[in-house]
Amino acid sequence: MLILAGFLLLVSTMTNIEAGIKVPGTIIGTGTKALLGGDLTDPEDDGAPEEDTNYNAKFTSSDEPGFGGGEFAFNVFDNILGPGNDKWCCGLAGIAEGEGMHITAELEAPHLLTHFTLSSANDVPDRDPTTWEVQGSNDGEKFTTIFSYDGDNLFTDRLQVIRFDAEEDFDAQTTGYRFFRHITFKTANWPNGAFFQIGEIEYFGTPADDTAVDPRSKLATQWGILKNSQ
């Protein structure tokens, strides 16, 4: 009986990942080299975060908008995993109940999300999202949940890249969206201290209709600087 009780106690204190229970996502590696690259926000991987140009998306966030800035929000789209200005950390005033910390990428045309990656930052695992969603919208106001997670920390390492696929980790999409938003509702640290951080986000998909803009045409995040790619 004592052996059984000890085993049950051990199991009860293990995370789903440690216990080998199926969790969403596939770990594909660590560090910048593990990023897939060429996502919808920057198909050519030539975005210039210092100037906020050469992106195919306009970015907005609930807090700390901008690249650089001392761990500002847009750093999750800089195509680099690392400390400091290569991550978004740590929020200014806690995560408001039901509101969340969110960052949105606005594309020029609707896309069907086929897969995405989410990466941990360089330190403090208790800042990793544990309750979070990826959402889509076509007006930037009303968002529909595409993927949701509420559970143990999915990351097992720092600067780790996890891939999430349609039909495996979330439903195959039949509606295309122009806006894709990542929103965090809870971390292990919430609501205490420096509670939140993300390393990188990548979104991938197919045009929702035949009128979608050629991804080789680069649009700055300020909308209007068009660069023709050969």
Regions found by a protein language model. Give the residues of each.
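Short proline/glycine- and polar residue-rich coil/turn motifs
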Residues: 152-158
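Extracellular carbohydrate-recognition regions
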Residues: 19-62, 218, 223
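Short acidic, low-complexity intrinsically disordered linear motifs used
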Residues: 213-230
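Aromatic, loop-rich ligand-recognition surfaces of beta-strand-rich domains
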Residues: 19-30, 42, 66-147, 165-216
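Bacterial N-terminal signal peptides
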Residues: 2-12
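Bacterial Sec-dependent signal peptides at the C-terminal "C-region" and cleavage site
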Residues: 12-20
